[in-house]
């Protein structure tokens, strides 16, 4: 995504509505940016308010699973367990960074990728076009703009009885030229509702599943953005991210009882995206503070570099889409291909050297990863707590 900046003892673990854990140990980066046999899903409507454009999707998906659950093999003689294939869910895996990451992991033969996508057929075509081994991926429907869809995804995933070792929250929408807000099926401004709230609910619901994993390194990765970091040049390009006092978020981002912007200001499509990415990075850190010590799960965020050709810019003006890639390649020298960015995210998923929790990873010109600093707002502990608590209420967890 071009705008995006970038063992453990087995235990019994549960998350309550207050976001606290009950644990019982047993043995213990100018820019950078199966399904079971069948699944039937109703697409939710994306609603607009006060003259905003209406987006409606209603339909059903029915498809066969493309792979079976990998088994855990037992070594003979010594009774040791042979490491099984890892299982990773990647949202937004039908294009861009998500697809590149899915391909990079699947091609190793060491990972089974659950491609969680809104458009099943698009994802299926993308996987085939990318040459991904059929036995190493499964496509499942997920519309992050619908909380019901998120819940149904979790239920369907659990029915598959597949383990969950890593969750990658990658999907995002971006409407930089929008003058009026569009809303999700639940009435939230679309950028924040999809990029932040949808992922927030998904992560919370799947936290239990992650903790049950017997994989050596369990991880929850939320893709961040350099544009949400005001300590960078890209982060200071107007409009700058600013969550303010969260009055819009607390009001439900519905454009009726409150502003559709987190800070309560007038709507700006580009700022809404940047604000959503600040929420993503704050959420990662709050996950780390609340759950890392008790669960051993690694929580991380990243900026994989400037993917100037990404489909994330499909809503931008044509001139921008034409000039931005060569600008990044030849002027800023910050351009990163989708394939390279996918390899970087795959590193955060699988590399033993990147298990540190609470970290925001970036890459230098030599493609070496390093721990980057977040802006003052994106690392504000109290604001992270408030975003967490308000988000819990909005998605029905409190």
Curated annotation (Swiss-Prot):
One of its GO terms (biological process) is photosynthesis. It is found in: Plastid, Chloroplast. It holds the Pfam family adh_short. Phototransformation of protochlorophyllide (Pchlide) to chlorophyllide (Chlide). This is Protochlorophyllide reductase, chloroplastic. GO terms for cellular component: chloroplast. It catalyses: chlorophyllide a + NADP(+) = protochlorophyllide a + NADPH + H(+). InterPro entries: NAD(P)-bd_dom_sf, Prochl_reduct, SDR_fam. It comes from the Eukaryota. Its main location: plastid. PANTHER family: PROTOCHLOROPHYLLIDE REDUCTASE A, CHLOROPLASTIC, PROTOCHLOROPHYLLIDE REDUCTASE C, CHLOROPLASTIC. One of its GO terms (molecular function) is protochlorophyllide reductase activity. Keywords: Chlorophyll biosynthesis, Chloroplast, NADP, Oxidoreductase, Photosynthesis, Plastid, Transit peptide. Transmembrane segments: none annotated. Its EC number is 1.3.1.33. Pathway: Porphyrin-containing compound metabolism; chlorophyll biosynthesis. It is an enzyme of class 1 (oxidoreductase). Disulfide bonds: none annotated. The lineage of its organism: Eukaryota, Viridiplantae, Streptophyta, Embryophyta, Tracheophyta. Belongs to the short-chain dehydrogenases/reductases (SDR) family. POR subfamily. It comes from Daucus carota.
């Amino acid at each position: 995504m071009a705008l995006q900046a970038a063992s453990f003892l087995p235990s019994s673990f549960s998350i309550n509505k207050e976001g606290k854990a009950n644990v019982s140990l047993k043995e213990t980066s100018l820019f950078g940016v199966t399904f079971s046999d069948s699944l039937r899903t109703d697409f939710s409507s994306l609603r607009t308010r006060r003259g905003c454009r209406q987006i409606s999707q209603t339909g059903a998906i029915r498809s066969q699973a493309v792979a079976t659950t990998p088994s855990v093999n037992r070594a003979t003689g010594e009774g040791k367990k042979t490491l099984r294939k890892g299982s990773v869910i990647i949202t937004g895996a039908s294009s861009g960074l998500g697809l590149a990451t899915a391909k990079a992991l699947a091609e190793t033969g060491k990972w089974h990728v659950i491609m969680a996508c809104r458009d099943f057929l698009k994802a299926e075509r993308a996987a085939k076009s990318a040459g991904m081994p059929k036995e190493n991926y499964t496509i499942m429907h997920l519309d992050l703009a619908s909380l019901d869809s998120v819940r149904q995804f979790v239920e369907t995933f659990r029915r598959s009885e597949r383990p969950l070792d890593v969750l990658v929250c990658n999907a995002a929408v971006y409407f930089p030229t929008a003058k009026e807000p569009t809303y999700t099926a639940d009435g939230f401004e679309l950028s924040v509702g999809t990029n932040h709230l949808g992922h927030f609910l998904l992560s919370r619901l799947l936290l239990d599943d992650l903790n049950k994993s017997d994989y050596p390194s369990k991880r929850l990765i939320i893709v961040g953005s350099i544009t949400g970091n005001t300590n960078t040049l890209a982060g200071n390009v107007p409009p700058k991210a600013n969550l303010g006092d969260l009055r819009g978020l607390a009001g439900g981002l519905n454009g009726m009882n409150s502003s559709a912007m987190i800070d309560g200001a007038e709507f700006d499509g580009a700022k809404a995206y940047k604000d959503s990415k600040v929420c993503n990075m704050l959420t990662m850190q709050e996950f780390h503070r609340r759950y890392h010590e008790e669960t051993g799960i690694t929580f991380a965020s990243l900026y994989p570099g400037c993917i100037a050709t990404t489909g994330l810019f499909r809503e931008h003006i044509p001139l921008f889409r034409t000039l931005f890639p060569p600008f990044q390649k030849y002027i800023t020298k910050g351009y990163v291909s989708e394939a390279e960015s996918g390899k970087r995210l795959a590193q955060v998923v699988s590399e033993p050297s990147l298990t540190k929790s609470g970290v925001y990873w970036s890459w230098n010109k030599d493609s070496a990863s390093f721990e980057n600093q977040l802006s003052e707002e994106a690392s504000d502990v109290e604001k992270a707590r408030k975003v967490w608590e308000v988000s819990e209420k909005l998605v029905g967890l409190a």
